[in-house]
Amino acid sequence: MRKINFFDTTLRDGEQSPGVNLNTQEKLAIAQQLEKLGVNIMEAGFPASSPGDFNAVKEIARTIKNCSVTGLARSVKGDIDSAWEALKDGAEPRLHIFIATSDIHLKYKLKKTREQVLEQAVAMVKYAKERFPIVQWSAEDACRTDLPFLAEIVSEVIAAGADVVNLPDTVGYLAPAEYGNIFRYIKENARNADKVQLSAHCHDDLGMAVANSLAAIENGADQVESVINGIGERAGNASLEEIAVALHIRKDFYQAESTIQLNEIKRTSDLVSKLTGMAVPRNKAVVGDNAFAHESGIHQDGFLKEKTTYEIISPELVGVKTDALVLGKHSGRHAFKDKLQNLGFQLGEEEINKFFNIFKELTGKKKEFTDEDLISLILEEKTADRKIGYDFISLQVHYGTSQVPTATVSLKDQETDQVIQEAATGAGSVEAVYNTLKRCMDKEVQLLDYRIQSNRKGQDAFAQVYVRVMIDGKESGGRGVAQDVLEASAKAYLNAVNRYLVLKTNTEGLSKQAAVGS
């Protein structure tokens, strides 16, 4: 049976979702979970785009040992050199290099001839092979490229030393039959195509990214590039979890398997959703809240008699827990530590003690802690960047039905250690809090989106707030978790501003939006 390699690009193409900017600790948390998930390759970022991305890729490459870590590079020596410096300490350094090949890109973006592009592609693959043991070459906009020219340039980069050739549907244009045909054509017409791995990379502009990826596998693709929850540029990318489960459930049809640990899918999906602030639609295949719900009376009757009447995927297969065991104020440190280990957290004794003390303090207000509560609490602490921006100290809100809401906020400037305290009013309590935060930070911040959800049912559930803001023409997303909605709202807003400041500090040179090469 064929083995399909999974190339995960959540940390590169997924992070290009508008309003998403992950800090190094958040990227590292996702990378470690992707390693547990069993991906074969993870694309950690675009090292040449900014010092922040470079440092994150370098840290991930040093940490991850059980899969190959790669970075994106344009077909220029500076990008390749930067990627090598970031990736050279990894277990299996790999480069993902790209250049556009379609006539529309050549004419309007690159302003080069086919001959010039072919020459540049070959020269840069050769240059990359002087450093990297594995080089993947991508033909940006392959699906709108003249097929004879595509076969020619693929032949030449293979001769130059490329180990993997990626044929991306960069704009999500093709139907599955058309995309599959490209793989057949390249296999039949590109010289030595059988000596390299062919890779698929699909965008979801017409809603066919997963179908196209599976069509590529049917027609000889050895590797599939995908993203957790299908997030990414514009309408997103092919969803890793959907492809992996489809290969497993329909192994009889695809005759292919992978190393993906399916029982880690739900945990990975939840982590990416929390850290990016991008909620998973309830009706999302495999990981949505409704994926295993049965509403129709006829369906319920059949399901109760025999699950397989209406359920082709069991919740347990993808790691959906049906037992929500909880911790409470009488739970001891041993039970707390055991629960953290079961949730996949590998923490030292000092960290366990720190989180246990926070947990015990909160149980005075909150009767029960579910898995979701603990995950939210720990992620909030572990992924916070404490070096740049503002630290939340306290919040007080005065509200009455016949009064104008007033908020008082105390923050600490993490650069100067100065404590800032301001007060302001608003039409509602949340607006009062946000007007006060603006005063504290003296920044013009426009709120674009505000969402609130609870971890679970019950009046003592944690509130999770996600916001998107605009600062100096740049979008930034933030999240906040607290038992109080207003506190969570303040933390989310502050988190979005801090992310913007981190991005502003680290972004010199290319913006991450320049990295749309595949």
Curated annotation (Swiss-Prot):
The keyword Transferase applies. One of its GO terms (biological process) is L-leucine biosynthetic process. It is an enzyme of class 2 (transferase). Homodimer. Its cofactor is Mn(2+). Catalyzes the condensation of the acetyl group of acetyl-CoA with 3-methyl-2-oxobutanoate (2-ketoisovalerate) to form 3-carboxy-3-hydroxy-4-methylpentanoate (2-isopropylmalate). It holds the Pfam family HMGL-like. It comes from Bacillus licheniformis (strain ATCC 14580 / DSM 13 / JCM 2505 / CCUG 7422 / NBRC 12200 / NCIMB 9375 / NCTC 10341 / NRRL NRS-1264 / Gibson 46). Keywords: Amino-acid biosynthesis, Branched-chain amino acid biosynthesis, Cytoplasm, Leucine biosynthesis, Manganese, Metal-binding, Transferase. The lineage of its organism: Bacteria, Bacillati, Bacillota, Bacilli, Bacillales. PANTHER family: 2-ISOPROPYLMALATE SYNTHASE 1, CHLOROPLASTIC-RELATED (PTHR10277:SF9), HOMOCITRATE SYNTHASE-RELATED (PTHR10277). Residues 391-518 are annotated as: Regulatory domain. This is 2-isopropylmalate synthase. InterPro entries: 2-IPM_HCS-like, 2-isopropylmalate_synth_dimer, AIPM/Hcit_synth_CS, Aldolase_TIM, LeuA/HCS_post-cat, LeuA_allosteric_dom_sf, LeuA_bact_synth, PYR_CT. Belongs to the alpha-IPM synthase/homocitrate synthase family. LeuA type 1 subfamily. Pathway: Amino-acid biosynthesis; L-leucine biosynthesis; L-leucine from 3-methyl-2-oxobutanoate: step 1/4. It is found in: Cytoplasm.
